[in-house]
């Protein structure tokens, strides 16, 4: 009896960073990179993110690979850079605002605006929880697998709740970036 194997492959990543000011095509320190291939850029400037505050990204372009079909499961990675050393055990908590609309102010969950801006709506319970990056006592904290998220809509935005004990670096935020990598099943022909 022959059987097929189901492997996985990566689709095009989403790359959340301050593309407008500080972040070039890759982190300033190559060892901090979570980037695979050529990602789709999404603007998210955390230079004003204080401790115990929240921030949201701009809304993504369509997540569709072809037509209106899109990958369901995505792996989330984060590289954070504090203005000082965060409290060990502190967290950066990540949420997803799933939206059926490409328009920034339309169809958002939890009071999100769809704009790169502070998030003060207090609607985290209405967002999809992705996971938490638990800090160690380093200025830069990295995890390539903060969590996975199943995306129910073609559009959305990222929300960060900073509980690290420190503000984010406010200048030269050239290492701060987040990736969402689609995991796509790849059925292999029977051997």
Predicted regions, residues:
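N-terminal leader/pro-regions and domain N-caps
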Residues: 1-49
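Acidic Ser/Thr/Pro-rich low-complexity disordered segments
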Residues: 101-126
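Extended, solvent-exposed segments with strong compositional bias
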Residues: 27-38, 118-149
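Short coil-to-beta strand junction motifs in C2/discoidin
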Residues: 86-94
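Short amphipathic, basic-aromatic surface patches that mediate peripheral association
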Residues: 56-61, 75-86
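Noncatalytic modules at the cell exterior or secretory-pathway interfaces
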Residues: 69-78, 149-170
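Predominantly extracellular/luminal cell-surface or secreted proteins
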Residues: 93-105, 161
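C-terminal interaction-tip segments
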Residues: 2-19, 161-191
